[in-house]
């Protein structure tokens, strides 16, 4: 009867086997292959375009820009977002597969920027529409800052638990406050009060009736006499 013999492990076997968890393997594969969907609407996006060149070379981080949201797991918003563009941004985010991430790049995307001071159509922060993972302030941020934001996102992905990241699809989070308009009477009726437009000088002795009875240009000598 043959006895059971256990195989003898070679010394090099220990160096060939990696013990890890499925969660760590999933995080490692995702952080090394981020496929961004570029949503640029203003000047901040020009700084991100500098990363494509050989000086910064963002391909070394595994970034492959995609034109379809169904093939992307990262959306990078750069520039001003208006109320009219908000539903389109939310729709693009909802079409992305889970897990998905968002980087808000620039002051206009984070807070609305200088365009939100007296504007009724500017969204004051893209986080009112979609959840943001990394905020990148600046006007505009430098390409080095964009690389730092991507590095921070990669560290966040490496620490997260895949089961907790997947969440049910949320409804429309678009900021849809109804605007109330009140009809007021226009002050521009075409009839102007000439006494308010051309008030006579307080030191002049010319009466108002004398000042406005001349419809055609007259000389100052005729006006006084």
UniProtKB/Swiss-Prot annotation:
Keywords: 4Fe-4S, Chloroplast, Iron, Iron-sulfur, Membrane, Metal-binding, NAD, NADP, Plastid, Plastoquinone, Quinone, Thylakoid, Translocase, Transport. NDH is composed of at least 16 different subunits, 5 of which are encoded in the nucleus. NDH shuttles electrons from NAD(P)H:plastoquinone, via FMN and iron-sulfur (Fe-S) centers, to quinones in the photosynthetic chain and possibly in a chloroplast respiratory chain. The immediate electron acceptor for the enzyme in this species is believed to be plastoquinone. Couples the redox reaction to proton translocation, and thus conserves the redox energy in a proton gradient. Transmembrane segments: none annotated. The keyword Zinc-finger does not apply. GO terms for cellular component: chloroplast thylakoid membrane; respiratory chain complex I. It is an enzyme of class 7 (translocase). Its EC number is 7.1.1.-. PANTHER family: NADH DEHYDROGENASE (PTHR11995), NADH DEHYDROGENASE [UBIQUINONE] IRON-SULFUR PROTEIN 7, MITOCHONDRIAL (PTHR11995:SF14). Binds 1 [4Fe-4S] cluster. GO terms for biological process: aerobic respiration; electron transport coupled proton transport; photosynthesis, light reaction. One of its GO terms (molecular function) is NADH dehydrogenase (ubiquinone) activity. It catalyses: a plastoquinone + NADH + (n+1) H(+)(in) = a plastoquinol + NAD(+) + n H(+)(out); a plastoquinone + NADPH + (n+1) H(+)(in) = a plastoquinol + NADP(+) + n H(+)(out). NCBIfam families: nuoB_fam (TIGR01957), PRK06411.1 (NF005012). Its cofactor is [4Fe-4S] cluster. Belongs to the complex I 20 kDa subunit family. This is NAD(P)H-quinone oxidoreductase subunit K, chloroplastic. It comes from the Eukaryota. Gene3D superfamilies: 3.40.50.12280.
């Amino acid at each position: 009867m043959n006895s059971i013999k256990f195989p003898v492990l070679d010394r090099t076997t220990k160096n060939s086997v990696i013990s890890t968890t499925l969660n760590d393997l999933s995080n490692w594969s995702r952080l090394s292959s981020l496929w961004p969907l570029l949503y640029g609407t203003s000047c901040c996006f020009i700084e991100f375009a500098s990363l494509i060149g050989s000086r910064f070379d963002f391909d070394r981080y595994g970034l492959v820009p995609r034109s379809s949201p169904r093939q992307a797991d990262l959306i990078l918003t750069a520039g001003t977002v208006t109320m009219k563009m908000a539903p389109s941004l939310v729709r693009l985010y909802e079409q992305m597969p889970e897990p998905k991430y968002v980087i808000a790049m620039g002051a206009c995307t984070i807070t609305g920027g200088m365009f939100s001071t007296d504007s009724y159509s500017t969204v004051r922060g893209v986080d009112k529409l979609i959840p943001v993972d990394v905020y990148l302030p600046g006007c505009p941020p430098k390409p080095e800052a964009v690389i730092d934001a991507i590095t921070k996102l990669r560290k966040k992905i490496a620490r997260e638990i895949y089961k907790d990241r997947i969440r049910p699809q949320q409804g429309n989070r678009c900021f849809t406050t109804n605007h109330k308009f009140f009809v007021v009477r226009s002050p521009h009726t075409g009839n102007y009060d000439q006494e308010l437009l051309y008030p006579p000088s307080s030191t002049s002795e010319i009466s108002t009736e004398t000042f406005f009875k001349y419809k055609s240009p007259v000389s100052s000598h005729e006006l006084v006499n």
